[in-house]
Amino acid sequence: MSRVCQLTGKKANNAYAISHSHRRTKRLQNVNLQEKRIWWPEGNRFVKLRLSTKAIKTLQKKGLSAYARELGIDLKRL
């Protein structure tokens, strides 16, 4: 499974690791992904999602149905 947030689509970012002598080597900045089981009241069931921590904070504020509707995601397919 790829390291991508299922709601926001966030994925790894290319960056440089810079040493003391300022030599640069490429590295990845991965997304902080968490596996979450979230209650979906309209579907009357739990939905298991792989989410970034920013998406989890937004879910707590807006709610699952409103946030998925805003992003254009069909929860019935998950």
UniProtKB/Swiss-Prot annotation:
GO molecular function, one term: structural constituent of ribosome
GO biological process, one term: translation
Pfam families reported for this sequence: Ribosomal_L28
Gene3D superfamilies named among the record's database cross-references: Ribosomal protein L28/L24
Membrane-spanning parts: none
Keywords: Ribonucleoprotein, Ribosomal protein
Gene Ontology CC: one annotated term: ribosome
InterPro entries: Ribosomal_bL28 (IPR026569), Ribosomal_bL28/bL31-like_sf (IPR034704), Ribosomal_bL28_bact-type (IPR001383), Ribosomal_bL28_sf (IPR037147)
UniProt key word Ribonucleoprotein: yes
Keyword Ribosomal protein among UniProt keywords: yes
Family listed: Belongs to the bacterial ribosomal protein bL28 family.
Name this polypeptide is given: Large ribosomal subunit protein bL28
Organism field: Synechococcus elongatus (strain ATCC 33912 / PCC 7942 / FACHB-805)
Lineage: Bacteria, Bacillati, Cyanobacteriota, Cyanophyceae, Synechococcales
